[in-house]
Amino acid sequence: MLARRQRDPLQALRRRNQELKQQVDSLLSESQLKEALEPNKRQHIYQRCIQLKQAIDENKNALQKLSKADESAPVANYNQRKEEEHTLLDKLTQQLQGLAVTISRENITEVGAPTEEEEESESEDSEDSGGEEEDAEEEEEEKEENESHKWSTGEEYIAVGDFTAQQVGDLTFKKGEILLVIEKKPDGWWIAKDAKGNEGLVPRTYLEPYSEEEEGQESSEEGSEEDVEAVDETADGAEVKQRTDPHWSAVQKAISEAGIFCLVNHVSFCYLIVLMRNRMETVEDTNGSETGFRAWNVQSRGRIFLVSKPVLQINTVDVLTTMGAIPAGFRPSTLSQLLEEGNQFRANYFLQPELMPSQLAFRDLMWDATEGTIRSRPSRISLILTLWSCKMIPLPGMSIQVLSRHVRLCLFDGNKVLSNIHTVRATWQPKKPKTWTFSPQVTRILPCLLDGDCFIRSNSASPDLGILFELGISYIRNSTGERGELSCGWVFLKLFDASGVPIPAKTYELFLNGGTPYEKGIEVDPSISRRAHGSVFYQIMTMRRQPQLLVKLRSLNRRSRNVLSLLPETLIGNMCSIHLLIFYRQILGDVLLKDRMSLQSTDLISHPMLATFPMLLEQPDVMDALRSSWAGKESTLKRSEKRDKEFLKSTFLLVYHDCVLPLLHSTRLPPFRWAEEETETARWKVITDFLKQNQENQGALQALLSPDGVHEPFDLSEQTYDFLGEMRKNAV
């Protein structure tokens, strides 16, 4: 008899998933039975939740490792089937999570209130006992009621805004709805019940004490807004004249409606204040300067105190955080601000050769007479990094539109940035908006901006050297059209352990921190950990919901190490354009070290490629055009020609002149602007049309002479390379 054929891996996994689904459905049905109210039964159900959750995690790990190569026969729609199984496991996880939360709350309720059996036994004992025992029992009951009142308030609160449930166990409510608060927790998430009897967690910042008297007071105060006064106070206690201008009532009305206002006394003074629901007091620093404001008094709404100097400014991020549009751990992007401050953190700065302290020779560009090219220079850090994905990244609110999701990385020692700041743009799917991926599959060449494979070089001797990753989004506010960039979290991967040994080359799962790299102990989304209960199961679920970044450090082979050693000592870039950077370095070495009449000469050098190539590092789409043109040209070369280094360099210069120079000085090409989709689309259309014409006409000469092509007026800087001038510019 023939042996039974073993199931294929995906088929076997699908069978196990169906068995798990049946067990979860059975457990959910069992929890609905009347017997499930017993404590022992609840404990049994809770243990089953943990066991099933572990089994689901094992299946998820096995599913992630599966590939088409594991199948003995071709499977139709393999990726789609894997995605369906992943969705099923996620659904089962959510069901178990909801059941575990329900059981945990029932256990909490049981601790706070006596069971029916205890009440019956107490009533029987009270009937048998005498009058003195009845009095003692009444005192004990009153004591228990007072103790239970510590966590069960039974107070009514009114919702000051709309809140939509974000996770299982939250309570959705609308503005103006009356809620009965059952339990006040110190973490700011209270258990409340609405008029329909629905119970769940609500944020306390959305609630205000409700009473009919306060409602009457508020309505009367809103009717007399014209009598509201604003006073300026200084550190000396001097009081500025009250506001009496006729526009004050309109301003005060805007305050009550929006919570954000701008008070304009004169053209030169504009105070921007975010009115928070929790009351704040005026703050004075140790130097005695005025550094705060007294927030809006919710009950009286009678006075608003403002400091006069220095002008208190609260940025857009504070406004968005107060409005609930972004999580509390989001901040203005630190690395983006460094890029805007100057040129010293850009790749073109680190690409330029560096002089020795004597100013008589180059420090990182030397000539190898034996090889006839620039000399290889090893560095302390030389590695290749792959960005895999970002998971569970919180979503911003509907009031802002996300223009770009990206990761910025640089070398960091805990205090300062030690390299250029490299940016990799992420892609995402509407089905999984919290997951970012890199290096997507494309029909043509992969744009260098999306390339998740990065090289990293550094010769820094710092023992705390590591890689700083900052996840960010570029956004535009729907209401004002204001643009900005937010940090969605950061993480620091130290490259050496305490004994100075490099960390191993492997995949790292890094949990993100909130705030800025100079702030410690801040979470990206504090609401995730605030909801963590004491159970191990819920803590595991909470850890899985934390934002994280997956990266892989790859070990270098001999060829990769030789290639990287031709680059500057300190530089971060993408692997897809590394061969173009090496061409630039080799041609730079030829011009500065081999072909110069005198090494002490500082004359200007006529070389368009050296003068303009650093500009490509700030215009990735033009760099992609050069990559595409060079790949097309290289495919036509013979093997003997590819082995000839001098022939390759001269051919590369011809391709550069035909492709890059006309594009850089064309008036049809809009200026490069980060995260502007319309501009990026228009630029890529111009570039694509130009490359197509070059391919058809076998060069750019016809396009340059065409009356349709309009170019910028000629400038001598297009042809002139001044290496000392570039260094002076970078130093400034």
Curated annotation (Swiss-Prot):
One of its GO terms (molecular function) is structural molecule activity. SMART domains: SH3 (SM00326). Residues 115-145, 210-236 have a biased composition (Acidic residues). Changing S126A: Impairs interaction with PACS1. GO terms for cellular component: adherens junction; bicellular tight junction; cell-cell junction; cilium; cytoplasm; cytoskeleton; cytosol; membrane. GO terms for biological process: actin cytoskeleton organization; cell projection organization; cell-cell adhesion; positive regulation of bicellular tight junction assembly; protein localization involved in establishment of planar polarity; retina development in camera-type eye; signal transduction; spermatid differentiation. The keyword Cytoplasm applies. Changing P203L: Does not affect fold stability, as assessed by circular dichroism thermal denaturation melting curves and by NMR spectroscopy. Affects interaction with PKD1. Belongs to the nephrocystin-1 family. PANTHER family: NEPHROCYSTIN, NEPHROCYSTIN-1. Interacts with BCAR1, PTK2B/PYK2 and tensin. Interacts with INVS and NPHP3. Interacts with PACS1; the interaction is dependent on NPHP1 phosphorylation by CK2. Interacts with KIF7. Interacts with AHI1 and TNK2. Interacts with NPHP4 in a complex containing NPHP1, NPHP4 and RPGRIP1L. Interacts with IQCB1; the interaction likely requires additional interactors. Interacts with ANKS3. Interacts with SPATA7. Interacts with FLNA. This is Nephrocystin-1. It comes from Homo sapiens.
